[in-house]
Swiss-Prot record:
Species in which this protein is naturally found: Helicobacter acinonychis (strain Sheeba)
EC annotation from Swiss-Prot or TrEMBL: 2.7.1.167, 2.7.7.70
Catalytic residues of the enzyme: 260
Sequence segments annotated as region (Cytidylyltransferase): 334-463
Binding residue positions for ATP: 191-194
Disulfide bonds: none
UniProt xrefs under Gene3D superfamilies: 3.40.1190.20, HUPs (3.40.50.620)
Protein name: Bifunctional protein HldE
Length: 463
């Protein structure tokens, strides 16, 4: 599980949903008949919320007011299991509140309650002390700037310098026209309008897009220059060439919070793949999910997977998995099998295996491998479907499909802390045990087997 530190402006989003069919007798304005009220985490907290939805561990740093809204906000974060030890109380300001009025799924007005003053000296010190204390244990840092007073120039540059000192990935969602504030960041995520305003350059074609991204890299020393282009997707610079990554969204209902989704998904994907094109494709898919919903919506890994051609981010090649595990300090558990017609016995076995460590990797026999082992009538379920079903189990972290008759190549490459096999190997040699620190034999739950299910189906349909 990746640890991400999110620093920025915390915003409470409040929604009034209703219908409007009458005009007020007091003034020529519509009357809203409220049918529903809802609250959600906004600003940097929405970035944190998106990261949680994608499976990260999140530490949030920002400021709320000493008011009821601030207390509710912190409680909502704790319910989402966000670490709030970096959320500071400012007695001189209110908690930033944005109220949106929605009529027939259309936002008609937004009312903002906020104070944008810079942080006082004590709060600045406490914020930077918290960042300095936490930064070494983080995998990545996100600065979510909504220009509400938390991320001024000095604080932003201090945090970026700290991140670079500790070789941490740091991404910034920028606000305002002075991009020197974000210089030396790993990546920033301006949209087209924001970048046009900052560079005084109309982004009306590939030539100017390329020029803008080159300015970000050469003038502001942004390692991975990028711009989000709404319905046109994302454009980025790679080896001084413009690369376009088209959008995947089919229907757009509400773009609220889409930028938060993009920076959250980019961060996690970059940490996993270290490939900007793959990260942009993943972020586009995540954005496509949230703009198809109303409000500050979230995208799950399963929803993103459905958009990415029925693939799943847990299903990886051995090369990609080794890349992810390169700096891993957690206990890795490995098991393997066919998992043809997934049943309760399989799920129970995998849950027990996961309990032995932190990361559970499943080596999955390919269709060709199963045919060689079990005959031409197997598998019943194809490898893509078997892999997707396994990926849907919360106890499974990664799946690698292998073509060989045994997983010895996988085990040798992965060198897991614990190798798990079924108890039927009690008097047999466990293949690959020499490459694992420990081997554990685990019994399957009695009364469940793929063969028994197949026989039951055959009997039922022969009657």
């Amino acid at each position: 599980m990746r640890k991400i530190l999110v620093i920025g402006d915390l915003i409470a989003d409040y929604y009034l949903w209703g219908k409007s069919e009458r005009l007020s007798p007091e003034a020529p304005v519509p009357i809203l008949e409220v049918k529903k009220e809802s609250k959600s985490l906004g600003g940097a907290a929405n970035v944190a919320n998106n990261l949680i939805s994608l499976g990260a561990q999140v530490f949030l740093c920002g400021v709320v007011g000493d008011d009821l809204e601030g207390k509710h906000f912190i409680n909502a974060l704790k319910i989402r299991e966000v670490d709030t030890s970096g959320v500071l109380i400012d007695k001189t300001r209110c908690t930033t509140l944005k109220t949106r009025i929605i009529v027939q799924n259309q936002q008609i007005v937004r009312v903002d309650k906020e104070i944008k003053d810079p942080l006082n000296a004590d709060l600045r010190k406490n914020l930077l002390d918290f960042v300095a204390e936490k930064i070494q244990e983080m995998d990545g840092i996100i600065l979510s700037d909504y220009n509400k007073g938390v991320l001024d120039f000095k604080i932003t540059q201090t945090i970026i310098a700290l991140a670079n000192k500790h070789y941490k990935l740091i991404l910034c969602d920028p606000k305002g026209k002075d991009y020197s504030k974000y210089s030396h960041a790993s990546l920033i995520t301006p949209n087209r309008f924001e970048l046009e305003q900052a560079l005084h350059l109309k982004l009306d074609g590939d030539a100017n897009l390329l020029k803008a991204l080159q300015i970000l890299q050469e003038t502001y020393h942004i390692a991975m220059p990028l711009v989000t282009l709404s319905e046109q997707g994302i454009a980025f610079l790679e080896k001084n060439e413009l690369i376009n990554c088209p959008t995947i969204a089919k229907e757009v209902y509400d773009v609220t919070g889409a930028g938060d989704t993009v920076i959250a998904s980019l961060t996690l994907s970059l940490l996993e793949s270290k490939n900007l094109k793959e990260a942009c494709e993943f972020a586009n898919a995540a954005a496509a999910v949230v703009v198809g919903k109303m409000g500050s919506a979230l995208a799950s890994l399963e929803e993103i997977a459905l958009i990415l051609n029925q693939t799943h981010p847990k299903i990886l090649s051995l090369e990609k998995l080794l890349n992810i595990l390169e700096y891993n300090k957690q206990k890795v558990v490995f098991t393997n099998g066919c998992f043809d017609i997934l049943h309760k016995g399989h799920a129970s076995y995998l849950q027990k295996a996961k309990a032995l460590g932190d990361i559970l990797i499943v080596g999955l026999n390919s269709d060709a491998s199963i045919k060689r082992l079990k005959g031409d009538k197997r598998p019943i379920v194809g490898e893509k479907d078997r892999a997707f079903l396994l990926a849907s189990l919360s106890c499974v972290d990664y799946i690698v499909v292998f073509e060989e008759d045994t997983p010895i190549g996988l085990i040798q490459a992965l060198k897991p802390d614990i190798l798990v096999k079924g108890a039927d190997y009690l008097d047999k040699e466990v293949i690959g045990s020499e490459f694992a620190k420990e081997t554990c034999l685990m019994a399957f739950e009695e009364g469940y087997s793929t063969s028994a299910i197949i026989e039951k189906i055959k009997r039922a349909y022969n009657d």
